Structures are given as structure tokens and as C-alpha cells.
UniProtKB/Swiss-Prot annotation:
Cystine crosslinks: none
Single GO biological process annotation from the record: aerobic respiration
Organism field: Ruegeria pomeroyi (strain ATCC 700808 / DSM 15171 / DSS-3) (Silicibacter pomeroyi)
Amino acids binding [4Fe-4S] cluster 2: C75, C104, C107, C110
Record protein name field: NADH-quinone oxidoreductase subunit I
Length: 164
């Protein structure tokens, strides 16, 4: 005669697995959602986030770049091109500052190499384009990015200062 396993039979007839599954489903149904609705909601960004490039200015409006070309030299993708001319006061300023964003690998070496924090990778990550030519940034485009994002860039650099 076969032995009846009463605990197994009780589980089967009382639908224990079904109720455990229902409890788990209801737990997750009423818990807060982990997913955000992206275009309408945005998650937090780290102060170290590396997004769209920008050239910064001093508070008096003068561009920060001193044409030392360290960013051009350190760029592993060779995406940065700089031409410079000396000024009457002996300092140098750029006449051409181009970044080919199709080559850029967003490593942040240009930002680390810059002695005056002129070139930074800003907080903007939504810069999709329709044509390839729009991804070739010239000096004017980089300066306008810097003007647009200056407040957030300055805040992020201040938050990151203890770690630099």
C-alpha cells in the first residue's frame, strides 16, 4: 500500500503556491515604481557626468582658453583641432577650436588636462542631430554651449573639486 504524503496533499488542495504567487504579485503591484517615464521625467545626473562639450568664459566675458593645446595633445581620438595667434599683450588666444564629435570617445582627458578649466564636458546628453555636419563643433558653438550651461557646469565643478 502506498503512503500518502499529507503535507504535499494539503499544499496541493489549498493552493499554497497560488496564494504565495498572488501575495508576491500584489506586493510589487502596490510598491513604488522603479522605472521613470523618460521624456517627461529625468533621473539624477552625477556631477562627474561627461556630456556635450563646452568652452567656458571668465565672469568678465573673456574666453578662458589660453591656447596651450594640451587638450589637443592628450586627446586619444584626435578629435580636437586648435589654431592660435598671439595678442598684443603677449598672451595667446584661439582663432580656431574645433571638436569632431563623431571621433570623440568622451574620455574626459581634455577636461583633466586643461589648466584653466576652459574645456569641459557639460551636463547635456540630449544633443541628437539630423546630419553628420552638425556634429562638427566650432568655437562659436562651444562658447554658446558654455554660456547656456555655465551655472550647472560651475556647480558640478564645485561639487567635484574635493576629488580633483
Amino acid at each position: 500500500m502506498t503512503q500518502i504524503d499529507y503535507t504535499r496533499a494539503a499544499k496541493y488542495f489549498l493552493l499554497q503556491d497560488f496564494w504565495v504567487g498572488m501575495k508576491l504579485g500584489l506586493k510589487y503591484f502596490f510598491s513604488p515604481k522603479a522605472t521613470i517615464n523618460y521624456p517627461h521625467e529625468k533621473g539624477p545626473l552625477s556631477p562627474r557626468f561627461r556630456g556635450e562639450h563646452a568652452l567656458r568664459r571668465y565672469p568678465n566675458g573673456e574666453e578662458r582658453c589660453i591656447a596651450c593645446k594640451l587638450c589637443e595633445a592628450i586627446c586619444p581620438a584626435q578629435a580636437i583641432t586648435i589654431d592660435a595667434e598671439p595678442r598684443e599683450d603677449g598672451s595667446r588666444r584661439t582663432t580656431r577650436y574645433d571638436i569632431d564629435m563623431t571621433k570623440c570617445i568622451y574620455c574626459g582627458f581634455c577636461q583633466e588636462a586643461c589648466p584653466v578649466d576652459a574645456i569641459v564636458e557639460g551636463p547635456n546628453f540630449e544633443f541628437a542631430t539630423e546630419t553628420r555636419e552638425e556634429l562638427f563643433y566650432d568655437k562659436e558653438k562651444l562658447l554658446s554651449n558654455g554660456d547656456r550651461w555655465e551655472a550647472e557646469i560651475a556647480r558640478n565643478l564645485e561639487l567635484d573639486a574635493p576629488y580633483r
